[in-house]
């Protein structure tokens, strides 16, 4: 199989099959909901949809989203932007992706999903992106509904009563959950960046969505333990809101929360929330 074939298969598999950790989390959420409830019905439909999409090799959501590739920079000579775009164009022609790329100026559709800046491609060092192995290529497909629910805050925030500390960070994250309600296709998954600038905040937050929901608890220094504690607190408090699947009420509003911190300058303190819907389409391959 050629590198191009591997990339086409990566797009196909990411589009049609959720990672096992996400499927397990959805199934666990279903068991927590009351039989006969709207929440249970929603999650039953989600699980049935996932099974059918995987079996037939078709997109599990009609919005095949923005494609973001993270590529080990050691592969740059082999996995070029042109090669990735050709693979995306082939995947589109084969029906693995919807024609989902529109020019914001004249409204025309890029029928192969390829244009300047589309798909999004980052060449990175593996250690800088969660779960990316040496010689790895990772893909996230993030739909527009969930992208619309992503937010960025600047602390202090007088409206939230949020200061420049982890309590203020938590207030921002929970506000994002409340404002999303069911519009982001809950139950969602949050990738969060604390610090950085406005651009790196969103890049870092989205990269956290590559982290498995069932990863081992963080160890490390006091800083890492503080972030792990914050993840647990946000997950617990968000699920206590009762927003539930699709905003129809229930015990599961979020499936997971993944938080990273980046250095900031004295004048700025950003909290960036990348909201991902239940269809957390991500996959990593090694070439």
Predicted regions and their residues:
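Non-transmembrane, aqueous-exposed alpha-helical and coiled segments at domain scale
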Residues: 1-192, 197-287
């Amino acid at each position: 199989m050629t590198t191009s074939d591997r990339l086409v298969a990566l797009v196909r598999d990411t589009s049609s099959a959720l990672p096992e950790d996400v499927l397990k989390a959805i199934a666990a959420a279903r068991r927590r909901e009351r039989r006969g409830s709207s929440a249970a019905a929603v999650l039953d439909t989600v699980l049935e949809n996932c099974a059918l999409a995987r079996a037939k090799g078709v997109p599990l959501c009609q919005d095949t989203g923005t494609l973001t590739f993270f590529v080990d920079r050691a592969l740059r000579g082999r996995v070029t932007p042109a090669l990735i775009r050709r693979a995306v164009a082939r995947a589109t022609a084969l029906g693995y992706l919807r024609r989902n790329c529109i020019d914001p100026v004249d409204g025309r559709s890029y029928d192969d999903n390829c244009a300047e800046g589309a798909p999004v491609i980052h060449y990175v060092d593996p250690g800088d992106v969660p779960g990316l192995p040496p010689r790895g290529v990772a893909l996230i497909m993030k739909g527009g509904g969930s992208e619309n629910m992503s937010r960025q805050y600047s602390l202090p925030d007088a409206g939230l009563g949020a200061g420049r500390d982890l309590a203020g960070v938590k207030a921002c994250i929970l506000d994002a959950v409340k404002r999303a309600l069911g519009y982001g296709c809950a139950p969602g998954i949050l990738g969060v960046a604390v610090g950085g600038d406005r651009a790196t905040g969103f890049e870092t937050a989205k990269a956290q969505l590559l982290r498995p929901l069932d990863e081992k608890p963080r160890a490390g220094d006091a800083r890492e333990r503080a972030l792990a504690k914050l993840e647990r607190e946000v997950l617990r408090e968000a699920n206590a809101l009762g927003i539930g699947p699709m905003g129809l009420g229930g015990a599961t509003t979020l499936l997971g929360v993944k938080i990273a911190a980046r250095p900031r300058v004295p004048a700025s303190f950003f909290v960036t929330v990348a909201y991902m819907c239940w269809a957390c389409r991500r996959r990593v391959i090694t070439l």
